[in-house]
């Protein structure tokens, strides 16, 4: 691994205010916001954090009744954040394009510091997650002949990029999609990373990212906007991948697959909604929710069949740990909803 020089400095939050929420009906709360949001992280039923375009991040502590909106300032950059992760005491947000900037934010004070910076002109970061309070991972498109993967083992204070000699090689034109902050899925000490473009593969890392293997998938691939957009695990053995062709969202062939052997093999799911940017298991169940700009979809039994439950489209969403609340986001909007209301829409 190559050690990356990290620049630290402390900054203060600006432009903190509360957004008014439109309550459509009991159980559904929506808010308009002046940014595009592709990164969400749910702490519990009532608390959700977001990161988006125009240097913005924020949160709700009251089930989406009110939202706090904050702005990070770094030089004169107009930053777009498409990755967010939350630990016990900190929030981490990562900008998408070069220079890739990763900030650690104190939950109580909302002061923040830069903990990782990558200036390679090819830098493009897609997703970030933490296993626990100490170990975290972020993934980006290749800057050499492998995916860009950076790790932290000290609670996010420092990050190291894994050298390509320790990673599976990437095919030219293979990358990842920064569509929903869900092309990483963590379970136990493993990481599942989804790719797309010229090839659609799943990289599986063990022992907090120490060793890696790449597995081929049957998801549609070969063009710039085809491949896997989202991955989520039910267990170490069982995971689902979803994506498709962003330029032909109505296509349903080869857009969703499941593994029951830890990623070694993947079986296509024929009855699926077509293009999906985010798919998530409802915790402790075999039920799934999926979303894209075409709508929201629901499956009761390991994706065997799907029902469209809303025509309203969202880039991404998250489910609270006990499965009671969901938070959705898209272009200029945030929505919170309890699971009973969602399934009865």
Where are these regions (language model features)?
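Beta-strand-rich domains and repeat architectures in extracellular enzymes and scaffolds
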Residues: 29-55
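Blade-level signature of beta-propeller repeat domains, shared across WD40, Kelch, NHL, RCC1
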Residues: 320-345
């Amino acid at each position: 691994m190559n050690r990356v020089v990290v620049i630290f400095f402390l900054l203060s939050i600006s432009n903190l205010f509360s957004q008014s929420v439109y309550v459509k009906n009991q159980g559904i709360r929506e808010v308009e916001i002046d940014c595009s949001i592709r990164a969400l992280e749910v702490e519990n039923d009532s608390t959700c954090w977001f990161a988006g375009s125009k240097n913005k991040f924020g949160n709700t502590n009251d089930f989406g009744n009110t939202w706090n909106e904050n702005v990070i300032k770094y030089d004169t950059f107009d930053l777009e954040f498409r990755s967010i992760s939350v630990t016990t005491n900190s929030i981490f947000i990562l900008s998408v394009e070069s220079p890739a900037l990763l900030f650690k934010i104190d939950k109580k004070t909302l002061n923040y510091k830069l903990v990782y910076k990558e200036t390679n002109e090819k830098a493009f970061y897609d997703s970030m997650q933490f296993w626990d309070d100490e170990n975290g991972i972020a993934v980006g498109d290749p800057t050499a002949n492998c995916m860009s993967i950076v790790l932290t083992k000290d609670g996010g204070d420092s990050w190291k990029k894994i050298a390509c000699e320790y990673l599976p090689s990437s095919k030219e034109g293979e990358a990842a999609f920064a569509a929903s902050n869900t092309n990483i899925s963590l379970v136990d000490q493993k990481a599942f990373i989804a790719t797309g473009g010229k090839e659609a593969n799943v990289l599986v890392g063990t022992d907090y990212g120490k060793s890696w293997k790449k597995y081929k998938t049957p998801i549609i691939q070969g063009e710039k906007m085809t491949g896997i957009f989202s991955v989520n695990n039910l267990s170490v053995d069982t995971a689902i991948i979803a994506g498709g062709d962003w330029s032909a969202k109505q296509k349903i062939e080869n857009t969703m697959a499941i593994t029951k052997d830890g990623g070694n093999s993947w079986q296509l799911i024929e009855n699926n909604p077509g293009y999906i940017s985010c798919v998530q298991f409802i915790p402790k169940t075999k039920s799934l929710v999926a979303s894209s700009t075409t709508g929201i979809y629901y499956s009761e039994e390991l994706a065997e069949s799907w029902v469209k439950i809303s025509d309203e489209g969202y880039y991404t969403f998250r489910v609270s740990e006990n499965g009671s609340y969901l938070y959705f986001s898209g272009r200029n909007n945030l929505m919170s909803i309890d699971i009973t209301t969602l399934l009865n829409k």
